Amino acid sequence: GLAVMSEGYDGSGVGILLRDIGGPFAAMKHIPILSGIFSSSGLKRLDRFMMDRGFTTKYKVTFKANGARPTGVPKRDVYLVRAYDYPTDWEDYSQEALLRELMPIRLRLQEMGAAEKDMVVFSFWPDTIMIKEVGDPVAVADYLQLDRKDLTARVIMLQGRQNTNYEIDLYACHPFFLQGYATMTNGENTAFIQNRDFLMSRGFDGYHGYLSDSEVFTHSLHYLISYLGLGLECYKHGITPLNDDAIETHPDTAFLKHLKYACRSLIIDGPNCVIGCLPDTTLFMVQDRKKLRPGVIGGSDGTYVFSSEICGLDAVIPHRDKQHDFQPMHLDTAVVTPRRLKVELLCQADPLMVN
C-alpha cells in the first residue's frame, strides 16, 4: 500500500502509528509504551529520567537497519519502542489518574531532547506505537524493516509526506497523536494561525508544538470530544459548521448556534480531507466544504482501508466489493467502529445524538 502511493511523495518523511497492537505487546494493553529516536547519550538520559520516576522496562523493540542508510535519512543511534510498568507508588491510582500522568512526562522528554538534540519522543501512551523518519517513505520502510512480524496492529495509520511549508522536522510528519486521539490530513490548513492561537489559549499543556499546520486537527478533535465532552458527531460542527440558514432549520438550532460562536476560531477553510482515530479505535473520515482533496473508504471481512486514492484500497484489499466503496461528502462524517462491520454515516443535517 505504501509503494503504490509513491507519486505523491516528495522525500520529506514518513510516519506510522499503530493502535490495538498485537504480538508481544498484546498482553500489555494498559501500560504505557514510549516511542522515539535516541542518540547513545540520549538513551542514557532517558534511562535515568524514567528510573528516577519509578518506571521499569517491561519489554522493548529496537529497529535494526537493513542495508545502507537511504539518501536524506540522518544517522541515528537507536529507534526505540519500550513498554514500561508504572511506578509501584502509583498502584492505587485509577486508570484515569494514570493516564493523566503520561502527557507531562512526554512533554518533559521532548523538552530535554530539544535542548540537547539527543532524543525525539513521539508518543508515551498505552497500546500506541509511533515511528517517524525523514526521507523517501518506501526506502525508509525497507531500511527500518517496518514489516517485521513482531510488530503488528489492528489499526495502522501511515502517511508518506509531512507538511513542507516549513523546515523539515520529524515532529511535522503525519500522523499526529494526543491522549488517544490521532489524525492525518491531506491538504493545507489555511486557517492554521487562528486555529492554533485558539487552542493554545485553552490552558491545556498538550496543545503545543504545531510544526505542521495539520496538527491542529488532532488537537481540535481532542478539544471537542475530550475537553468539552461532546461526541464525534460534533467534530464537523466545530471545524466546518453549517451556514446560518441551515442552522436555523436544524433540530438542534440553539446548541449549534452556541457551538459555532464559541468555537468560531476552530473553523477551517480547507482544502482538507482528515482521517482520524479515537481512543476506542473508532476510525473516521471528514471533508471540508470545498471537498478538493480526495478520500475513499473500502472494506471486506472486517478489514477497512481509508485512503486518499482508490489505488491505495486496491493495493491492500483488492478483492473487496468495490460497489461498497464510499467517498464522504462535505456534510458527512464516515465512521467505522471497532467491530469493523460497515461504514456508518453521521450527517450534519441530522439531529445530534447527544447535546
Task: Report residues per predicted region.
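Conserved short alpha-helical segments that host acidic/polar catalytic motifs at enzyme active sites
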Residues: 1-355
